[in-house]
Amino acid sequence: MRKCRTIALVFLISFLINLPGFGQKISKEELLFLTPNWTGERFEDGRPKVADEILDRMKEVTHEEAWAVLKNEGYKYQYAENWETIHSDRVLVGRALTATFMPGRPDIHDAIDKRGKAEGKRGQNSWPVDLLMPRDVYVANQFGLHIGGPTIGDNVGNAIYAKSGNGIVYDGAVRDINGLKAIDGFVSFFSSYHPSHHNQAGDLNTMLIGINQPTQIRQVTVMAGDVVLGRDGAVTFIPPHLAEKVVITSEVVRLRDMFGHSRLREGVYTAGQIDTRWSPEIEKDFSQWLNNHKNDLPIPKEQIEEILRERTW
C-alpha cells in the first residue's frame, strides 16, 4: 500500500508541475479542458455548477442506484468506503471543491507559501476554504496522514460550514472532534481522528500542492465540480454531466418499486411477474398508475409527467 501511494504521489507531482497555476488553483482554461462533457452553467472560475434542483433530488439517491448508472457509463471507480463520519444519520450532497496535500518538502513549500502570501493569503490549510461557495463540499486528499496530519479542527470546520453549509470528505485525520460534532449540519467523512495538528514546529510534514486539480480520494479520481453523495458510511463522486441521469434513474427505480410493492400487496401480480422483466401489460399498468397517482407520489409531479412523456406504452 505504501509503495502504491509513493508511485501515485510521484505521478501526481509530475502531472501538476505541467499544469498552469501549479501549487495553487487550477486555471480556468485547464478546468474547461478537463471537463468537456459538461455543457451547463459554470462558476466564474470554470468549475461545473450542477443545478441546486439536481442536488436537492440527489439526497434521495442510494449508492447502489448511482453505482449502476456510473458503471454502465464506464465510470467504475467512483465509490469510496470505510470512513469515520460525523452526523452519520444524514446525507451529504454538494459540488466538490478539491484540495491536494503532499508530504512537506521545504523548497517547494516555501515557494508556494511565498506566492500565496504575496497575494495576501495566510496558512495554506485555509486557502481552499476561502474559495468555498454555498453547497460546495470540501474534498481534500491529505494522503491518509494520521499523527501530525490534521489541517481541520473546529475553527476551520466552522469556517467551512459558514461558507458552504456542508461538511467535508477528508482523506486524513481531523482534530477537535467534539467541536466538529457540535456543528449542526457538518455532515462529514474522514479517515481518522488525532489530537495533533499538521506542520508543528520543526516538522514540515504537509503542504498544499493544488486547488481544484484532479485529486485522488482512495481509489477515486475526483474532479472539481463532481457531485458528492455521502451516506451510509460511504461516498460516491458523480461526474457533473451524469448527475441528472443518476437522479432520474433513481426516481424511476423508486417509482417502479412502489408500484411493484403496491400491486403485490393487492394480489394483482405474483412475485415472479414483478421480479423479472415486466411484460408490456405490466408496463402499461405502471404508466397508468403513475398518471393516476402523480399528485400523491414522493417525486415532483413535473418529473413524473416527464417520465410519462418519454414512455412509449
Model-found features: residue ranges?
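Positively charged n-region of N-terminal signal peptides that target proteins for export
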Residues: 1-5
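Bacterial N-terminal signal peptides
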Residues: 8-18
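Boundary at the C-terminal end of the N-terminal hydrophobic targeting segment
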Residues: 21-23
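Amphipathic alpha-helical packing elements
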Residues: 26, 31-59, 66
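Basic, amphipathic alpha-helical segments enriched in Lys/Arg and hydrophobic/aromatic residues
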Residues: 46, 272, 286
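Buried hydrophobic positions in well-ordered alpha/beta secondary-structure cores of metabolic enzymes
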Residues: 46, 160, 226-228
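Feature captures the catalytic cores and cofactor-binding loops of soluble hydro-lyases/lyases
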Residues: 57-65, 69-224, 237-283, 291-313
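Short acidic-glycine loop/turn motifs at beta-strand connectors
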Residues: 231-232
